[in-house]
Structure formats: structure tokens, C-alpha cells
């Protein structure tokens, strides 16, 4: 995306890995560094997937809280559709304006959940997402590595439809993220999430600032 001047950072991992907490902390820390974090309409805010747009939030409810299980390809295509809307309406304009965007999940969740864990194939799921991505991939993807059993215990509360599928799915998802990390080593960083929140946050911030600095070098600044 040639007109892009911002930085896209995504946090990933199995359910209960702590990514939502770390995404919020990262936004706070980057903002404290004086960086223009989050969308201009909501400075400092994390963008979540599925969601981030009115259409995305509506489909999120179907995906995570619908009354019945969805066929794997239905699930994959709905995620791809909400992602295309997010890219068009939010990500490309905000990155073009030089914002630093922190996302709670993005394309790699589809690759790990639907591509690997659901058995649709990483290449097949990537292919259906590519038109909507319009060439956009993260500058940095942080995968918080946590034992899925610990993650499910951490998640707490009423589980969403995917969390309710239990440990077997989450173990396959964790394996899927490991495959994604090996597939895209230039942008995916595995960070041990089974530590104190503040210690993890230091590592997440360091990786993010490195990505911001690298992006600055790419735009000559």
C-alpha cells in the first residue's frame, strides 16, 4: 500500500492469552511516547476484530453469540467480509494519515482458527481474504504464547461460541499460530504470555517500538 505512512500492530493468540489486556496497555504506553495511537475518531483506542465498524460489530454478534454453530467456510467468509470493511473504512485511511493502529486480532486469527484448526487450509483462507486486505499486512504481529488450558481458565465469564468449543479447539489454534509464526517470520513475534502482566507488557512495548522505528526508516523519517 504505497500511500501508507502509519504503522499496523496486531496482537494474537488463543482465547484467554491476555492479548486484549496487552493491546490496551500497549496503546497507553505508545501514547505516552507521544505517538498518534488509535483511530483519529477515538485516539488511544484498540481496534477489535471482528468489529471496528458498524457492520463488523453486527456480524461479531452472529459469529460469537449466534444461536447455532456455523459451517467452517461460513465462519471464514464472515470474518473475511468484516475485515474487508474494516480495511476500507478504517485501516487504510488511518494508516494513510500516519496513525499507529493496534488491533486485537486480524488476518492471522483467521489463518490459525479457520485455516488450521478448522482444517480449511491456511493458503485457502488467505486467498479469500486477499481481495479485502488490498495488500495490507501488519508491520508487526505479536502472538502471546500461552498454554491453551491456562488460557481457558483465564478467560472466565460466559464463554462465547468459539470459547465454548473447549480445549481441543484451543490446542489446535495454538498449533495454528505456531505454524503462522514460522510461515511469516519477518513480521510475527512470539512472546511468552505466561508471565506477570507488566513483564509481558515491557516485551510487547519493546517489539512495538522497534516496529515503529523500522517503519520510520522505511518512510525516511
Predicted stretch roles:
Residues 35-133, 203, 207:
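ATP-dependent small-molecule kinase phosphotransfer cores
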Residues 105, 109-175:
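A glycine- and Lys/Arg-enriched "phosphate-lid" helix/loop adjacent to the NTP-binding pocket
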Residues 19:
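Conserved lysine of the Walker
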Residues 2-3, 25-27, 149-221:
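NTP-dependent small-molecule kinase module
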Residues 11:
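Hydrophobic anchor at the beta1->P-loop junction of P-loop NTPases
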Residues 22:
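Hydrophobic positions on the alpha1 helix immediately C-terminal to the Walker A/P-loop
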Residues 1-8, 36:
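Extreme N-terminal, non-catalytic leader segments
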Residues 16:
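Walker A (P-loop) phosphate-binding loop of P-loop NTPases
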Amino acid at each position: 500500500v504505497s500511500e501508507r505512512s502509519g504503522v499496523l500492530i496486531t496482537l494474537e493468540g488463543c482465547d484467554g492469552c491476555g492479548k486484549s489486556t496487552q493491546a490496551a496497555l500497549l496503546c497507553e504506553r505508545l501514547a505516552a511516547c507521544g505517538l498518534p495511537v488509535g483511530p483519529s475518531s477515538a485516539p488511544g483506542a484498540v481496534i477489535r476484530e471482528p468489529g471496528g465498524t458498524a457492520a463488523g460489530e453486527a456480524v461479531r454478534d452472529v459469529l460469537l453469540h449466534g444461536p447455532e454453530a456455523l459451517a467452517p467456510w461460513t465462519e471464514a467468509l464472515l470474518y473475511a467480509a468484516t475485515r474487508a470493511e474494516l480495511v476500507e473504512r478504517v485501516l487504510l485511511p488511518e494508516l494513510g494519515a500516519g496513525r499507529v493502529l493496534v488491533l486485537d486480532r486480524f488476518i492471522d486469527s483467521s489463518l490459525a482458527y479457520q485455516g488450521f484448526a478448522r482444517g480449511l487450509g491456511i493458503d485457502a483462507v488467505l486467498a479469500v481474504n486477499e481481495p479485502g486486505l488490498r495488500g495490507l499486512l501488519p508491520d508487526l504481529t505479536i502472538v502471546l504464547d500461552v498454554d491453551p488450558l491456562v488460557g481457558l481458565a483465564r478467560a472466565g465469564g460466559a464463554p462465547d461460541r468459539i470459547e465454548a468449543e473447549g480445549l481441543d479447539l484451543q490446542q489446535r489454534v495454538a498449533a495454528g499460530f505456531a505454524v503462522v509464526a514460522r510461515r511469516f517470520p519477518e513480521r510475527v513475534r512470539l512472546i511468552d504470555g505466561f508471565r506477570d502482566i507488566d513483564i509481558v507488557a515491557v516485551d510487547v512495548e519493546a517489539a512495538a517500538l522497534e516496529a515503529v522505528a523500522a517503519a520510520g526508516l522505511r518512510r525516511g523519517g
